[in-house]
Amino acid sequence: MPPKTRGAVRKPRKKDKKNIALGQAHIKSTFNNTIVSITDPTGAVISWASSGEVGFKGSRKSTPFAAQMAAEAAAKRAQEHGMRKVDVFVKGPGSGRETAIRSLQAAGLEVGSIQDVTPAAHNGCRPPKRRRV
């Protein structure tokens, strides 16, 4: 029986530098995490970051500081692709909403407009029961 040969070794594909000046920043801020996705105008994701991805675990992911770090990381990666101006879409009730927007501006992205696109139920599913602490 001949010795097994390993398959072709795959080289990691280098991301091609897109040159997109205008885009959209989608901030999803839940009670447990904050996810920042920066897309081109068609909606194709250019860069993203979340509180968990930048190194926070557990209940620290839901803090405004974690949202700030995630937004900065996503903005830096987007600027490598030539992003300069974003329109911001915020979704969810979490604590990192405003902090994420501020840190996008601080990272050097110009914020054009801010829209709240939080989905509101028209009396759909029953919400979770009240917490008793």
UniProtKB/Swiss-Prot annotation:
- Disulfide pairs here are none
Q: Gene Ontology cellular component? A: ribonucleoprotein complex; ribosome
Query: Which key words are in the record?
Result: Ribonucleoprotein, Ribosomal protein, RNA-binding, rRNA-binding
Q: Name one GO molecular function term.
A: structural constituent of ribosome
Q: Which stretches does UniProt call biased (Basic residues)?
A: 7-17
Presence of keyword Ribonucleoprotein: yes
Q: Does the keyword Ribosomal protein apply?
A: yes
Task: Give an example GO biological process.
Answer: translation
Q: Where is this region: Disordered?
A: 1-23
**InterPro entries from the xrefs?**
Ribosomal_uS11, Ribosomal_uS11_bac-type, Ribosomal_uS11_CS, Ribosomal_uS11_sf
What family does the Swiss-Prot or TrEMBL record give for this protein? Answer: Belongs to the universal ribosomal protein uS11 family.
Tell me the function of this protein.
Answer: Located on the platform of the 30S subunit, it bridges several disparate RNA helices of the 16S rRNA. Forms part of the Shine-Dalgarno cleft in the 70S ribosome.
Quaternary state and interactors: Part of the 30S ribosomal subunit. Interacts with proteins S7 and S18. Binds to IF-3.
Name recorded for this polypeptide: Small ribosomal subunit protein uS11
**In the UniProt record, what gene is named as encoding this protein?**
rpsK
